[in-house]
Amino acid sequence: LDVKIRYIKKWIDQRRLAAEMYNHYLAEISEISLPKVHKNTFHSYHLYVVEALHRDKLATYLNDINIATGIHYPKPLPALDCYKSHKLDLAEFPRAVSSAKSILSLPMFPEITEDQIRHVSSKIKAHYSK
């Protein structure tokens, strides 16, 4: 870790630049909601997570053409076993429930290129243009 920590600022800067490129190329796809960054916050973009209409179909399509995606948060927090004792009603968390059904992580790593981001974005656009 000592070796890697020297590169953390550079890697975060590269991820932030990649996120800007994704935001640019995906901006006009109405079926995709981009990550929101709130005022006075700093996003490291460890993941680049969008909300996608018909997420599972999009994920399957992208995976079938060798574009790796991920669903990093498949359950809303109140549905996790560690919260069972709290007897939480999922109906009280509609945004968490809907997000868990629509979020999709797109390829993100410090060395991702603009060409790769453009390729991923064009395939997403093609999927929704069918």
Region spans (language model):
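PLP-dependent aminotransferase class I/II
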Residues: L1-K130
